Amino acid sequence: MSILDTAKAGNVLYEVGAYNLPTTHQTIERIYQDLLPHQEKFCKDIDHRKLALVCGFGAGKTYALCSKAVMLACMNIGHVSAVFQPTAPMLRDILIRTFNELLDQWQIPYTFRASPLPEYQLSWEEGTHTILLRTMLTYQRLRGQNLCAVGFDEADTIPKRDAESAMNMALARLRSGNVQQFYATTTPEGHGWAFETFEKNKKSDTALIQAKSSDNPFLPDTFIPSLYENYPPQLIKAYLLGQWVNLTSGQVYDRFSREDHVIDKIPFDTKMETLLCGVDFNVMNCNCVVGVRDGEKLVIIDEISKQKDTDALAQEIK
C-alpha cells in the first residue's frame, strides 16, 4: 500500500489544520463571500432550467461561471457536469486558469486531468464531483453522457446555429443529479443566440440576468472611461451596458443622423467649385457621389447610380 493511499487529501499551502476535506456547505459559504450582487443572483437561481448572465466587459462573467459550476457541483455530489468555452485556446487560457485560481482560493482539493480530454475531480467530505471541460463545436461528444449541469461561457461569439445545437444537446443530457440546470454567461453580441434564447423566445423555464461593466467596482479606474473614449455608441451599449444591440444589420453608418447631416439648401454657389467624386466601379452598375469642399467640411451635392460602365459614368458627371 502506498503512503498516498493513507494520506488525507489537501493542499500543502493551506492553513494549519486545513488538511481535512471541506464540506460542501463550507465551500458554498466561501464562494458567497466575494460575489457581486449580479453574480450572487446568478448563482442562487437553481429554479430555472435555462439561466443566463449577460453583461458588459469586465463585469465578472467567467468568475460567475466558475462559481456557479462549483456550487452546482456541491449540490450534485457523485455526479458529472460540464463547462464549455468556444475554443480550445479560450478553454486553456481563460477557463482552466480561472478555475485553478478559484479552487485554491476556496480551498477545494482537486485533481486535474489534461488528456485525453480535460476534466476536474473536486473532493469534499461528502464525496467527489467531476467537471468535464469541452469546446462548444465539439458538443457532439456529449452523446451518451448523463450530466447534472452544463455551463457555456461566451456562447454568443460562435454562430447562432452552432450555439443552439450545442444547447439542445446539453439540455438532452441533463438527466442525473439533484439539481439539473443549463447556464450561460456571455457578452451580448447583437441579436444572436443569447438574445433569441433568453429574450425574444424566452420560455417559462428560462431566466435572464443582465449587468453593466460598472457593476464591478474592482475594475481599474481607467478601464471604463477608456472604452467610452474609443468605442462608438452601439458598442458602448453592448459591451459596457450589456444591452441587446443589432450589430450586424440595418443602418450601415450607425452615427449618421438626418437632423445633423442633411441640409435643405447649399449655402454657396457650387458652379465654380472643384468637384470631388467618390466612385464605386462595377460592371453594369457604376455608382458615384459628387461633393465640394466647404472649408474643413465635405458637402455631397449629387449621387449618380447604376451606370453601365466608366464612360457612361463620366458622361453623366459632365
Predicted feature residues:
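Pre-P-loop entry segment of helicase/translocase ATPase cores
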Residues: 1-50
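Walker A/P-loop NTP-binding motif
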Residues: 62-77
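Conserved RecA-like ASCE P-loop NTPase motor core of nucleic-acid helicases/translocases
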Residues: 79-91
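Inter-Walker segment of RecA-like/P-loop motor cores
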Residues: 90-148, 244
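Walker B catalytic acidic pair
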Residues: 153-157
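ASCE P-loop NTPase helicase motor core
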Residues: 159-230
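ATPase catalytic-site recognition across NTP-hydrolyzing enzymes
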Residues: 216-278, 284
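Nucleic-acid-processing active sites and adjacent nucleic-acid-binding tracks
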Residues: 271, 291-318
